[in-house]
Curated annotation (Swiss-Prot):
GO terms for cellular component: cytosol. The keyword Transport does not apply. CDD domains: GrpE. The keyword Cytoplasm applies. Participates actively in the response to hyperosmotic and heat shock by preventing the aggregation of stress-denatured proteins, in association with DnaK and GrpE. It is the nucleotide exchange factor for DnaK and may function as a thermosensor. Unfolded proteins bind initially to DnaJ; upon interaction with the DnaJ-bound protein, DnaK hydrolyzes its bound ATP, resulting in the formation of a stable complex. GrpE releases ADP from DnaK; ATP binding to DnaK triggers the release of the substrate protein, thus completing the reaction cycle. Residues 1-31 are annotated as: Disordered. Homodimer. This is Protein GrpE. Belongs to the GrpE family. GO terms for molecular function: adenyl-nucleotide exchange factor activity; protein homodimerization activity; protein-folding chaperone binding; unfolded protein binding. It comes from Campylobacter jejuni subsp. doylei (strain ATCC BAA-1458 / RM4099 / 269.97).
Amino acid sequence: MSEQKQEFENENAENSEHLQDENLQNIEDVEQNKLQKDYDELKDKYMRANAEFENIKKRMEKEKLSAMAYANESFAKDLLDVLDALEAAINVECHDEISLKIKEGVQNTLDLFLKKLEKYGVTLIKEEKEFDPNLHEAMFHVDGENHQSGEVVTVLQKGYKIADRVIRPTKVSVAK
């Protein structure tokens, strides 16, 4: 019997060792899974933070470019009154030689002024036949015998824009 008892104890010891090995393996697997999960969570957080940082960089660059493009907007808007005055001076009829020379000088000044405005992105809004509320300001409506409804009849004051932003709409009369 003692031989059987010995065999039984040996089997028990082997089973016990085998169970301990399995338990140890299970513990290692659980720890490895936990570490992998922690790693995946941290990697996901890193990727999200990095993507958010890149989006912030792009947004800041876009805002910087926009600020640069429109930095002179209010200054340019104020200069449009000077431009209007120069254009009005050009439209005055001259009858003597001195007035013609002055008008020529004003025209040269106006041309230079327009070139400088264009250099900084201020451009004339092109005249369009159809009324566009994004570009035009309707001052009044007229009966348009020769014009279709909604068509621009007369430009009363030129409009200007910087890049794609209107700084002064074109003031027009519109056919009913």
